[in-house]
């Protein structure tokens, strides 16, 4: 379906973001991630220096978790959807909202409120393809 295709495209974009972020832990590729970090910390703080091993580990971990999120969305849209579109939508929706609430809340706590705003782009990207379909599916169930 068109909804599944949109979710698979979203999954690819999220995996690409995660791979870029993880690869940014390698010093020659940090500049690509620094652009995002500067936007996420704007206007309160400059982007942090990630020269230390702990910061680079956190980038690698964040990237890895983003890749896993993208793979989960792909699997839901591709495999789970065929068995139960409603279950796939719930899985994607609940995963997206749990990520958004935790990531955005603690981004604000960390002094990077713009990251919460940037997170809205990812949240919309994942949830908008399901608009309307969820209510129809639950009514039919």
Regions found by a protein language model. Give the residues of each.
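Cytosolic juxtamembrane helix and N-cap/initiation of the first transmembrane helix
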Residues: 1-23
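Membrane-helix boundary elements
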Residues: 16-57
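Alpha-helical transmembrane segments and their membrane-interface exit regions
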Residues: 38-41, 120-133
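Short juxtamembrane and helix-loop transition motifs at transmembrane-helix boundaries
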Residues: 50-55, 72-87
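Alpha-helical transmembrane segments of helical membrane proteins, especially in multi-pass transport
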Residues: 58-74
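Membrane-helix boundary connector in multi-pass membrane proteins
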Residues: 101-118
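Short, charged juxtamembrane terminal tails flanking transmembrane helices
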Residues: 134-141
């Amino acid at each position: 379906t068109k909804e599944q295709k949109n979710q698979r495209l979203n999954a690819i974009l999220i995996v690409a973001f995660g791979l870029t972020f993880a690869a940014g832990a390698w010093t020659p590729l940090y500049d690509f991630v620094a652009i995002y970090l500067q936007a996420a910390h704007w206007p309160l703080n400059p982007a942090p220096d990630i020269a230390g091993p702990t910061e680079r580990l956190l980038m690698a971990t964040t990237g890895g978790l983003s890749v896993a999120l993208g793979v989960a969305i792909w699997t839901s849209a591709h495999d789970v959807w065929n068995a139960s579109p409603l279950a796939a939508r719930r899985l994607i929706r609940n995963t997206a909202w749990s990520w958004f609430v935790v990531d955005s809340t603690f981004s604000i706590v960390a002094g990077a409120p713009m990251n919460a705003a940037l997170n809205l782009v990812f949240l919309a990207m994942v949830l908008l393809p399901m608009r309307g379909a969820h209510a129809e599916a639950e009514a039919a169930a």
